[in-house]
Each structure stands twice: as structure tokens, then as C-alpha cells.
A protein has these predicted regions:
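N-terminal helix-turn-helix DNA-binding core of bacterial DNA-binding proteins
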Residues: 4-45, 68-77
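Beta-hairpin "wing" of winged helix-turn-helix
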Residues: 56-65, 72-74
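Amphipathic alpha-helical dimerization/coiled-coil segments
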Residues: 78-127
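Alpha-helical residues within the helix-turn-helix
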Residues: 38, 55-56
Length: 127
């Protein structure tokens, strides 16, 4: 890590939608884009743009499974230099009313794409 990548990391945190996405990803090992969209009640284009920015800043990683794109926080390994920063950020999120609302909504909307598309359950079961 150098100062340029560190600056990009902190710049990635300077937007409320990106902070809300990070808060959700701190709650789950990984999330499908459709779960993030449904939880935050934002358009797909907005969420995708912010996820792309977080990916550029090396804050999130993604993987494709069938038609779905999943995102995760790779920084949650103790060996990563910013691991403890994210732990501190999680504690800060616990004191944020908007963040608590998002977490509560996530528990209600989790796996939205699977629930709204019965064929997805068959695809996921095959893997």
C-alpha cells in the first residue's frame, strides 16, 4: 500500500451511499447486488456506480454466479493493513441511525433475487 492507494481508499469513504454499502457488507460475508439495491431502495445504476468506485479503491471484490454479481469486503482479514480501521468503522456504524435502519431492512430483504425468481433457487442448488 502506498499513499496514492491510501488516498483512494479514504476518498472512497467520502460518499454516504458508499458508506451505507460498506455497512451492509460488514454485516454479511457477501451480498448480491440485488440485495443491496432492495435494501437501500436505490436505482441499480446508482448502486452499480458506487460499487464500481469501491472496487476501484480496492475496498470490495466481486464474483459472478450465474446472472448475479456478488460483492464482499476482502479487507476483513487481519493481515490487511486496514483491517482494524474497518473494525472501528463497524463500531461507528453501530451508533448511526441510518445504518441501523439499513441493517434491519437487510434482514427483511436478504436473498431478494432468489425469492423473486424461483428458477434462481434451482441454479443455486446445482452449485
Amino acid at each position: 500500500m502506498n499513499t496514492t492507494s491510501l488516498a483512494l481508499f479514504y476518498k472512497s469513504l467520502s460518499e454516504p451511499v458508499r458508506l451505507r454499502i460498506i455497512n451492509l457488507l460488514l454485516q454479511q460475508e457477501e451480498l448480491c447486488v440485488c440485495d443491496i439495491i432492495t435494501t437501500l431502495t436505490l436505482p441499480q445504476s446508482v448502486v452499480s456506480r458506487h460499487l464500481a468506485y469501491l472496487k476501484k479503491g480496492a475496498i470490495v471484490t466481486s464474483r459472478r454466479q450465474g446472472n448475479w454479481q456478488y460483492y464482499a469486503l476482502p479487507l476483513m482479514t487481519p493481515s490487511h493493513p486496514l483491517h482494524y480501521f474497518l473494525i472501528s468503522l463497524r463500531q461507528t456504524f453501530e451508533q448511526c441511525a441510518d445504518c441501523a435502519h439499513d441493517v434491519a431492512r437487510l434482514s427483511q430483504t436478504m436473498n431478494y433475487c432468489l425469492k423473486s425468481n424461483p428458477e434462481a433457487l434451482l441454479i443455486q442448488g446445482d452449485q
